[in-house]
C-alpha cells in the first residue's frame, strides 16, 4: 500500500491523553490493506470518523504483516478492532475463493504447471 503520511492531528473525538493510553493492537496481512483501507489509505479518515477511533498503521519489518493500532475510548476501540478484523477475514476468504476458482479454471483448460 505504500508509506502513509505521518499523522498531523488527533481527531476531535479522541480525548487526550486518556484515549491514547492502552491502544488495541492487532496484525493484518499487508496484501489486504488496500482492500480494507483503499488506495494509499484513502478510507482511513472515513473509518476513523464513523468508528470514533484513531488508527495508526505500522509495517513490520521482515514480515508480510502490518500492525494496526486503534486508539479511542474502550468500547470504540473494541468495536473498531472487531470490525477491521472481520473485514480482513472477509477479504482474505474472498481472495482465497478467487484463487480456487482460478485453479479450477486452469485445470479445466488443462494448462500445465509451467503456465501458472
UniProtKB/Swiss-Prot annotation:
A Gene Ontology molecular function term of the record: mRNA binding
GO-annotated biological processes: regulation of gene expression
Induction line: Down-regulated in differentiated embryonic stem (ESC) cells, compared with strong expression in undifferentiated ESC cells.
CDD domains, per the entry: FILIA_N_like
A Pfam family reported for this protein in Swiss-Prot or TrEMBL: MOEP19
Keyword tRNA processing: no
Domain KH residue range list: 23-84
Stated family: Belongs to the KHDC1 family.
Entry protein name: Developmental pluripotency-associated 5 protein
Species of the source: Homo sapiens (Human)
Amino acid at each position: 500500500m505504500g508509506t502513509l503520511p505521518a499523522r498531523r492531528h488527533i481527531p476531535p473525538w479522541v480525548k487526550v491523553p486518556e484515549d491514547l493510553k492502552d491502544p488495541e493492537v492487532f496484525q493484518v496481512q499487508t496484501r489486504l490493506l488496500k482492500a480494507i483501507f483503499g488506495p494509499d489509505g484513502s478510507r482511513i479518515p472515513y473509518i476513523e470518523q464513523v468508528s470514533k477511533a484513531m488508527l495508526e498503521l505500522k509495517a513490520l519489518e521482515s514480515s508480510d504483516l502490518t500492525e494496526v493500532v486503534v486508539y479511542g475510548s474502550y468500547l470504540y476501540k473494541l468495536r473498531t478492532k472487531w470490525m477491521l478484523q472481520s473485514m480482513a477475514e472477509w477479504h482474505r476468504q474472498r481472495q482465497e475463493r478467487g484463487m480456487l476458482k482460478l485453479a479450477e479454471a486452469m485445470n479445466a483448460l488443462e494448462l500445465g504447471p509451467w503456465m501458472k
